[in-house]
Structure formats: C-alpha cells, structure tokens
Amino acid sequence: MNLYLIDGHSYFYRAFHAIKNLSNSKGVPTNAIFGFTNMLFKLLREKKPDAIAIVLDSPVPTERHRIYEEYKAQRPGMPDDLVSQIPHMKKIVEAFRIPSFEMPGYEADDILGTIAKKAAAAGVDVFILSGDKDMMQVVGGRINIYDPMKEVLIDEAAVIVKFGVPPERVAEVMALTGDAIDNIPGVKGIGEKTAKDLISCVCSLDELIDHPEKIKNERLRKMISENIDTIRLSKTLATLDTGLQVEVDMKNLTAGKPDWPALQKMFSEFEFTSLLKLIPAEGHKQRASYITITDKNALTIFLGLKG
C-alpha cells in the first residue's frame, strides 16, 4: 500500500508562481487554483495512490516562533491574490475527497513527518510531495520525497549526496549553514560544503562542539566555539518534531471517488474549460432547465465552457 502526502501551502505557492495573470471574466484571480487542480489531476491519474492526504500550515504561531522571535520573520506577506484563492483550493481538495490535516500551533512539516513515520512503521510506502529541504530528515526506508512538477524522486541515497550525511543528520548540517528561507541563523561564513565536511567527520554535532580540537582549521574552530548557542538554537529550529499526537488510520486516508458535480460547478464558475473536459461523462450534472443568452460576451464565454 502507498500513501501520498501533499504539503498544501508549498504547492499553493508553486502553483501561484507557475502561472501568471489568470482570472475569470469577472476578474477573480484563478491562476493558483488552476495550477493546483491540474497537479491533483496529474497525481491521481498517473500515480493512482492507494491513500492520500494534504497537510496545511496553521496561522497560529508555533513553538519555533516562541523560542526565536525572528523565525521566518523576513518572509514577505502572502500576496493578496493568493490569499483570496486559498479557500477555493481547500474546497477543491474537499471535492476531490482528499483528507486534510491542520493543527493550530504546528507546522505542516512536523505533521507531514509524523504521519509519514507512523504510516511507514505500519508497512506503508510513503511519498511526500514537498519542495522543502527540511523534509529530507525523514527520508529513508519506506519514505521518499516526490516532486510531481519536476518528476523527481528523492530517496535516502539522494539525501546523502546532497548533505553528505544520512537523513537523520540533515538538521546538524542546517545548524551550521542556517536556512535563509526560514530565517534560521546558523554560523555566518559557513556554507553547505564546509558544513557537510565538518559534520561528516564526527559522530554528532555535540561531538563537534565538545571537541573543537577535531577541527583542524583554526578559523573554523574559532567560528564554532564563538557560536555554540546559535548552533544549538539553529539545530532545534531545523529539527522536525515527528512525535505529534496525530491519529493515522489508513482506512480514513483511502482515496475516494471525487464529488464530480461539485467540481463541475467550481470549474464552470472559474471558467476552466480544459478541466471540465477531464470530468467523466457520468460525473456531469444533467441540467433540467435551459437558459436564454442575449449578450454577445456571455455567449462567447458560454461557448468556451461548452467547448
């Protein structure tokens, strides 16, 4: 059995930036909705998942924000045109009958990691759809990361190539490099290559900190010794919490039949002609009434939907 876990907000953003300047005839922005829905169709069509779920970030501040006020503080606010589309994308997910998870005060990455670990322990092959390198911490065994847009599969071997250490030690590398996206400080002046070399030569980050004599380069040795508190903080911020109280019942995650009439209604509203064509014949809601169109522009739109 397999389980596909979608990092919701990650793909909302990717869809938003992948397609520009798309809206319906009423001027309602639809680019993210269209791109995200296409991704769902592609995933369901090509991978035919046995089970599937989407995980969303909560707007409530997390434990990471409590221990470090600057966590993600540099990120610009979500664009208004994307904000307005998120409720619609959530309705699309609901119409596809895809279960969703969201926990106030917890990040999607932690929830994804927790579900993935529990499912893998139950013998399920897990594929996480996320572009966040933090998720590479949980890769290994039955857990892989899959990017449907690039059609790339990241397994344990790929993580080792990238970070120079096994997945469970990725956070140690990030403790030194920091992460500009999440505003994790790390040690200024230490890049990924240097961090990989340092961490791969010791059994743990603590060993590197407790035994600076193992660092041959005097400049690096000084950088580590002068930033011990920052390094420990950065590791805490970078480490996923995969022990959340999340109930994972695979029976409730089984991929169900989409609510085609609901999808048809939304696609018509958003004027997604190409997506309407993907709804199977039996899924189209039959109309018992007719409409009279007297406006030329309305006729053009109607013919586009029908075509």
Question: Which ranges hold each PLM region?
Answer:
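Non-catalytic nucleic-acid-binding/docking modules located in mid-to-C-terminal regions
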Residues: 48-53, 96, 121, 142-144, ...
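Noncatalytic, basic helical substrate-engagement surface that gates or grips nucleic-acid strands
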Residues: 1-129, 133-155, 230-233, 239-247, ...
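A generic alpha-helix structural signal
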Residues: 33, 37-40, 86, 90, ...
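Generic detection of long, well-ordered alpha-helical segments
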Residues: 30-33, 79-83, 227-228, 256-260, ...
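Charged, flexible boundary elements
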Residues: 101-111, 279-307
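A short, flexible N-terminal coil/short beta segment enriched in small residues
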Residues: 73-76, 262, 300-307
